[in-house]
């Protein structure tokens, strides 16, 4: 299992990092080491710190992160119990920490009963909660937003856009371009030269469009 961390700044995608820290992997490590809850918490913190240290230095050092948007089944399960009766999509760090302390004191059997899930799924919930807790601490975020969407929602939205059934106001192509430029800065590329080459290449592409017959996707690939 793995986790993807994406950083947005004012609607623009800054970077995306895939981290080998999914809850399945964390659960296996905890079970293999036969750790206590406190030991498991320390191990998870160490693993997340190890994976995020470079990412944090490069992308978070000059940024103030206020919101963490969490997507996935484990956070939804935790959220439904934390949000009972409130009908809010956000969880404050104070509420999350209180709930985490409550969860940390539960046995596996108590976790099963509390969330009304089977043993296999119940064993994922503490590692998931510990992972989100550490992410809050590392980023300094004050609120977790839980929109309640799944991967299938994204697939359905992509299909609907391809079939012209819906139209997004957000530009995903611009996300790709911004991320590419941030990567170029990361590797100390000469930005004025890159911008001049990009501008010239796109002008040639656009002026010869009736001859080459290529579309918007090919133009995006050239721009990248």
Features from the language model and the residues they span:
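Active-site-adjacent helix-turn-beta-strand microarchitecture at beta-sheet edges
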Residues: 1-2
């Amino acid at each position: 299992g793995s986790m993807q961390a994406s950083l947005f700044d004012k609607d623009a995608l800054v970077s995306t990092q895939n981290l080998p820290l999914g809850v399945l992997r964390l659960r296996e490590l905890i079970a293999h080491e036969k750790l206590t809850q406190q030991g498991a918490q320390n191990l998870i913190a160490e693993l997340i710190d190890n994976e995020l240290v470079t990412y944090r230095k490069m992308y978070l050092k000059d940024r103030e992160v206020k919101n963490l948007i969490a997507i996935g089944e484990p956070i939804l399960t935790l959220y439904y119990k934390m949000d009972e009766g409130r009908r809010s999509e956000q969880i404050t760090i104070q509420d999350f920490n209180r709930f985490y302390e409550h969860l940390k004191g539960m046995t596996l059997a108590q976790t099963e009963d509390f969330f009304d899930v089977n043993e296999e799924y119940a064993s994922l919930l503490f590692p998931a909660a510990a992972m989100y807790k550490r992410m809050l601490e590392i980023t300094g975020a004050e609120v977790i937003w839980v929109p309640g969407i799944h991967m299938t929602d994204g697939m359905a939205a992509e299909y609907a856009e391809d079939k012209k059934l819906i139209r997004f106001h957000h530009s995903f192509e611009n996300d790709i371009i911004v991320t590419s430029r941030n990567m170029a800065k990361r590797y100390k590329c000469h930005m004025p030269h890159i911008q001049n080459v990009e501008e010239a290449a796109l002008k040639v592409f656009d002026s010869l469009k009736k001859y080459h017959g290529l579309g918007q996707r090919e133009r995006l690939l050239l721009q990248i």
